[in-house]
Amino acid sequence: MPQLATICYIDNGKELLMLHRNKKPNDVHEGKWIGVGGKLERGETPQECAAREILEETGLKAKPVLKGVITFPEFTPDLDWYTYVFKVTEFEGDLIDCNEGTLEWVPYDEVLSKPTWEGDHTFVEWLLEDKPFFSAKFVYDGDKLLDTQVDFYE
């Protein structure tokens, strides 16, 4: 069964806005630092979902730009996650408290030292290096990354 979702990394030119997932009980992302995002709602485009999730979780009005798509086979029981990856450099507003965790601006050189999903290191580097649009697959067994495949499109 497929689950469609977005993940968004907001970039202020020297830092990424990261979400430390430390507030939701029974959270598959508990304790990890990730971008903001969430599941697509019925009738919603990935772009609309990304903008809505950014506003709901951060209070920022943003213009997300699609940078890639990642497939996570059986990331949660019986669900393959298809995640649209966005980068944001145009945004306005003030941060709000997020009910899913703590928001923090993290300098580029500290992003990869935060506890995160192993595969996130890979695609966050692609975002920071401004790699071309990508289609990737990250295969996990629990927290362990087993396999990565990627195609870049010029």
From Swiss-Prot:
Domain of life where this protein originates: Bacteria
Cofactors demanded by this protein: Mg(2+)
Entry coiled-coil feature ranges: none
One protein family per Pfam: NUDIX
Example of a GO MF term: 8-oxo-7,8-dihydrodeoxyguanosine triphosphate pyrophosphatase activity
Enzyme class: hydrolase
Protein name as annotated: 8-oxo-dGTP diphosphatase
Organism: Streptococcus pneumoniae serotype 4 (strain ATCC BAA-334 / TIGR4)
Gene for this chain: mutX
